Amino acid sequence: MTSFPYEIIEDPRPRLGLIALQVDETIEEDFRQMFPQPAARLHISRVPSGAELTPDTIAAMEEDLPQAARLLPPAARFEVIAYGCTSGTSLIGAGRVRELIHANATTHAVSDPLSAAIAALRALKVTHVGIVSPYIASVAAPIRAGFEAADLVVPDMLGFGEEIEARVARIAPASICAAAHAVAARAELDAIFLSCTNLRTLEVIPTLEEELDLPVLSSNQVLGWHMASLAGLALRDLAVPGQLGKKAAQL
């Protein structure tokens, strides 16, 4: 075989890395919707996760997170890598997530849905937040605690009481909307947060904001927004829904 010369070039687009749960059927599609291909390069790894999301399966994810980070392309230099689990971050700890990812992949910044949600709420200058979660109380409650530790007030929280991730991915958008209306009716709120990256939320955000006259945030929406902000991407080039999509982060 004759050797032929070639040239090497680097793609100038920002690289984003996403570590999704093995059972998550929603986040990857949502991210490809929010980040059109010309805007950034998106690389996705998966972390093993049980069919049920419980404190025990989340603890196991902490052990598997380093290997999931190492499965991202090792030659790539990422602007941001995110761990895509809201409840996982609340139980493992955002600081620990950052530590594990930085130790196992090359990236300027690390994000997660809990940190992203707090940054988004601060950017929107809201303090009283209602939460809708698909999970049982032992998985959902630490998210509330994470918000409260960031000096946010959570007047009310609703959950679907679900443990099986395959069912979470199939919760009807109409049910999500009904829960958002219910939590808004039960307390004075500045915003609503729809928790869980496996919940199908992007499509309902514009309608809910119009009906409730409140900012409506969700795990995938805030994570995409936060990653874009950390990577220096212009929000006008993305498709982040709702009021948040027009708001720059205060980093």
State what each model feature region is.
Residues 1-70, 132-172:
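N-terminal glycine-rich anion-binding loop in soluble enzyme alpha/beta folds
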Residues 62-76, 175-189:
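Short, well-structured alpha-helical segments in soluble
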Residues 68-115:
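Glycine/small-residue-rich loop that forms an oxyanion/phosphate-binding "nest" at active or ligand-binding sites
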Residues 78-84, 130-131, 189-196:
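Periplasmic-binding protein-like
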Residues 98-121, 208-223, 227:
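Short, acidic/small-residue loops that bind anionic groups at enzyme active sites
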Residues 178-211, 223-224:
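Hydrophobic alpha-helical
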Residues 218-251:
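C-terminal functional extensions of proteins
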